[in-house]
Amino acid sequence: MEGTDWSGWGDDSDFPWPKGSRVTFPSYQLEDPPYAAPSDLDLVGKGHLHIAFVILIVSLFVLLLGVLLACHFLRRSLSPISVSSRCSPCRLFYDRCRPYTSLEKGVELSCV
């Protein structure tokens, strides 16, 4: 920074101790005591981990709900011509594919 007047900053008249003296601290004060509070970085990391876990659980729930709704609507919208395609989407989640007897066609599967 050119043009800045630094006179009066940091001269020895600001400090009451003699010139050349040093302040020393005992070694135990330089370390964190065992009862010290966790640092802010530790708390932020745990908070982010908790938020990520909640987002994961909610997204898995939404995914499961989407699969169940898709199965529900696919089950209703598929044509009754093909028996195997009618029951394949809902067989995994629903136990609604049950046999019924017909005099003309014999035993078939029906998704109700």
Swiss-Prot record:
Residues 1-20 are annotated as: Disordered. It is a single-pass membrane protein. Residues 1-10 have a biased composition (Low complexity). The chain crosses the membrane at residues 51-71. One of its GO terms (cellular component) is host cell membrane. It comes from the Viruses. It is found in: Host membrane. Keywords: Host membrane, Membrane, Transmembrane, Transmembrane helix. This is Protein ORF1.
